[in-house]
Regions:
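Helix-loop segments that flank and shape redox-cofactor active sites
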Residues: 30
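Histidine-acidic metal/acid-base catalytic patches
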Residues: 11-19, 23, 33-133
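Active-site-proximal, glycine-rich beta->alpha crossover segments in alpha/beta enzymes
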Residues: 1-7
Length: 133
């Protein structure tokens, strides 16, 4: 149901986004796993691909939040940055470190699972062309 509602919403707003040149972007779930039984919609590569293909429009994009994505040990931010750079409309550079039990903490930009140097290299052209980072 959550995905159907998201597709409906995106389908409804994309004509307006096209008309006014507005890029919409989804922020990955933070954290990228269930908490208290709440559903998640964008937690991994498959979810991002579904989201971008649900309404395949260049105005429908991704907020590349390295922190949210790196909080899930199943995600490799370096690969995600390469794969989804063209549809990334906003970049949020933060990093995390894994803790026992699936927990995580914020980490410095040069350490942690965010791999910010490598991820930034893949997103470089997009970052340079973007008004907001």
């Amino acid at each position: 149901m959550l995905r159907e509602n998201m597709r409906y919403f995106l389908s409804a707003i994309m004509p307006v986004c096209e008309e006014y040149g507005v890029n919409m972007c989804v922020h990955p779930d933070d954290p990228p796993f269930q908490v208290l039984g709440l559903p998640r919609i964008v937690t991994n590569e498959a979810d991002i691909a579904w989201f971008l293909n649900a309404v395949d429009n260049p105005h429908n994009g991704l907020t590349f939040c390295a922190g949210s994505l790196s909080a899930g040990e199943h995600n490799d931010t370096r690969e995600l940055a390469k794969k989804f750079a063209k549809r990334t409309h906003f970049v949020h550079l933060r990093s995390t470190a894994a803790m026992p039990g699936g927990n995580f903490i914020e980490s410095s930009h040069l350490t942690g699972r965010g791999h910010l140097i490598d991820s930034s290299a893949s997103l470089r052209k997009k970052i340079r062309d973007c008004l907001c980072v």
